[in-house]
Amino acid sequence: MAAVEENEAPSPVMAITGISEDPASIAAEDTAAQKREEHLRKFRELHLKRNEARKLNHQEVVEEDKRLKLPANWEAKKSRLEWELKVEEKKKECVAKGEDYERVKLLEISAEDAERFERKRKKRNPDLGFSDYAAAQMRQYQRLTRQIKPDLEKYAKLREESGEEFYPTSNSLLHGTHVPCKEGVDKMVEDLEKQIQKREKYSRRRPYNDDADIDYINERNAKFNKKAERFYGKYTAEIKQNLERGTAV
């Protein structure tokens, strides 16, 4: 038998390249491949994050542009409208439960807050008393206009239906095209009836007494004389009696 060689023959790859397969070099190549794959994965993640940041920045720019185009006091108006809507919902809830809204509101705030709100209200809208009829009518007009609550749902619906004609120009013809809804007409009639009832309550005409002494020149002067008699009558009663008897000094 031929003698068995102790050393095996080299592989064809090793014979051609002349490089031996070193385990250390193979491990180094695997480590380099893993690092390269890790770097590529991180690069893809950074690329996705950059695209997401670019998208968010664009959205913020659009929102900021919308805010800049709004009126200066838009945020304050929006907050106030939201607060008024919450108050209206609370009032409806109290009516459904059969409770008094003013009483419920006072139970939810402290006495100090209630006094502070009352001072602010009087400072903002002071009651200076009666000065003339024009001022009284103006105060009534302002009070009634403050009671008008905006209906944002109908406003948005009307704006959607009108389209570009919602903001009229010099060539727009919108006069006489608005038709009030039945709920609005009923609300106006109810409010007018309340005003009439309140006016009759506070200024109902007294029946005329034919036997009473006439010490006035007109109805307004008669009211003034009655008011003066109510406040100063007890001090002037003796003087009037002396004048009537002719014994006044």
Curated annotation (Swiss-Prot):
Residues 1-22 are annotated as: Disordered. Signal peptide: none annotated. One of its GO terms (cellular component) is Prp19 complex. Residues 34-95 form a coiled coil. Keywords: Coiled coil, mRNA processing, mRNA splicing, Nucleus, Spliceosome. It comes from the Eukaryota. It is found in: Nucleus. It holds the Pfam family SYF2. GO terms for biological process: mRNA splicing, via spliceosome. Involved in pre-mRNA splicing as component of the spliceosome. Identified in the spliceosome C complex. Belongs to the SYF2 family. This is Pre-mRNA-splicing factor syf2. It comes from Gekko japonicus.
